[in-house]
Amino acid sequence: MKTLYNLTKRNCRLFFKDKGLFFTSLITPAILLVLYITFLAKTFKDSFLSYMGDFPMNESLIDAVVGGQLISSLLAVSCVTVAFCSNLLMVQDKVTGSIKDLRITPVRTSALAVSYFCSTAVATGIVGIVAFGLCLLYLAQMGFYMSLLDVLAVLLDVVLLTLFGTALSSAVNFHLSTNGQASAVGTVVSAGYGFICGAYMPISNYPDGLRKGLSFLPGTYGTCLLRNHALA
């Protein structure tokens, strides 16, 4: 257990010591929030108003629904994409040869793997909590409506999706051995995951075959959890 703790501590230190990697992970949710507010907020609002037709609706209620949609989309995407960025240390150790030095020591391979998982979960969790704080500030500007129980439920969803993103990134990055491969995978995940998990577009808008295929992916249910609790 002490070995696992020391390895996890080492990985966390290396992550936070790399200012470029840390600030890239930290600023990603903020950039996404700005993009969502700029481009998606009006789209969501127009969509809701079109469904309501001539039915009178309080403007603050519409803003609350739009805010819930935006923060759930942001958190659903960030918890996974940031995990891939945080888990780059696994690839960097292979590139620099540090993994060979670690493997010749009397450290179990399982302890080494779990240390990468734990450090990635910690780093991603910190960024996820910061992102959630930014989302709460945005809701405060729009008109805060969430109860303490709702906030705790969303926070629990963030933890759950952080663990999912960490597991997914660990399974993928385990097979990567160069920075080019890691960059390519990160680009694909950042560009496509939001569509796959239903954050950018509702799954119901997809063709029937694609919709059934996406229903087998755990990420879609993580987005649903966040939507249910953010719009409760």
Residues covered by each model-derived region:
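Short, membrane-interfacial amphipathic segments enriched in basic
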Residues: 1-9, 165, 210-216
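Residue-level recognition of transmembrane alpha-helices
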Residues: 7, 25-26, 74, 93, ...
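Hydrophobic alpha-helical transmembrane segments of multi-pass membrane transport/permease proteins
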Residues: 10, 14-48, 67-82, 121, ...
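Residue-level recognition of membrane-helix boundary sites in multi-pass small-molecule transporters
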Residues: 20-21, 111, 181, 212
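Hydrophobic alpha-helical transmembrane segments of multi-pass membrane transport proteins
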Residues: 31, 35, 62-141
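Transmembrane helix segments
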Residues: 34-43, 173-227
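Perimembrane loop-to-helix junctions flanking transmembrane segments
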Residues: 47-62
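Alpha-helical transmembrane segments and their short interhelical loops
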Residues: 109, 117-194
